[in-house]
């Protein structure tokens, strides 16, 4: 009564195949399989101990003096333009 019979599911499957086509469904299936495989590989790689990994060396840090010097070079003096 409240559940779906096998005939209901077969009709739904037939409609889905007619709407999307077999090629589109095959592509979606392979994409989904690749995503699941990538997820499993990521979970497997994430479980490695930190001792096995190489330490991350931070990129060169910009000091406040370097940032101020760069900002000063990029600043345009509006009053100097008006005086000329």
UniProtKB/Swiss-Prot annotation:
Lineage summary: Bacteria, Pseudomonadati, Pseudomonadota, Betaproteobacteria, Burkholderiales
Pfam families: TatA_B_E
InterPro entries: TatA/B/E, TatA/E
Residue segments, region Disordered: 40-84
GO molecular function: protein transmembrane transporter activity
GO terms for biological process, alphabetical: protein transport by the Tat complex
Membrane topology qualifier: Single-pass membrane protein
Keyword hit for Cell inner membrane: yes
Family, as annotated: Belongs to the TatA/E family.
Gene source species: Polaromonas naphthalenivorans (strain CJ2)
Chief location category: membrane
Keywords: Cell inner membrane, Cell membrane, Membrane, Protein transport, Translocation, Transmembrane, Transmembrane helix, Transport
Assembly and oligomerization: The Tat system comprises two distinct complexes: a TatABC complex, containing multiple copies of TatA, TatB and TatC subunits, and a separate TatA complex, containing only TatA subunits. Substrates initially bind to the TatABC complex, which probably triggers association of the separate TatA complex to form the active translocon.
Gene Ontology annotations for the cellular component aspect, listed alphabetically: TAT protein transport complex
Transmembrane segments: 1-21
Basic and acidic residues composition bias: residue spans: 69-84
Protein name, UniProt field: Sec-independent protein translocase protein TatA
HAMAP family registered for this protein in UniProt: TatA_E
Location in or out of the cell: Cell inner membrane
Cited function: Part of the twin-arginine translocation (Tat) system that transports large folded proteins containing a characteristic twin-arginine motif in their signal peptide across membranes. TatA could form the protein-conducting channel of the Tat system.
Gene: tatA
């Amino acid at each position: 009564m409240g559940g779906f019979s096998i005939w209901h599911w077969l009709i739904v499957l037939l409609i889905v195949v007619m709407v999307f086509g077999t090629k589109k469904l095959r592509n979606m299936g392979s994409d989904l399989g690749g995503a699941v495989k990538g997820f499993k590989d990521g979970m497997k790689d994430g479980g490695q101990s930190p001792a096995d990994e190489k330490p991350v060396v931070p990129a060169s840090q910009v000091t406040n003096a370097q940032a101020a010097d760069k900002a000063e070079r990029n600043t345009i003096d509006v009053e100097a333009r008006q005086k000329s």
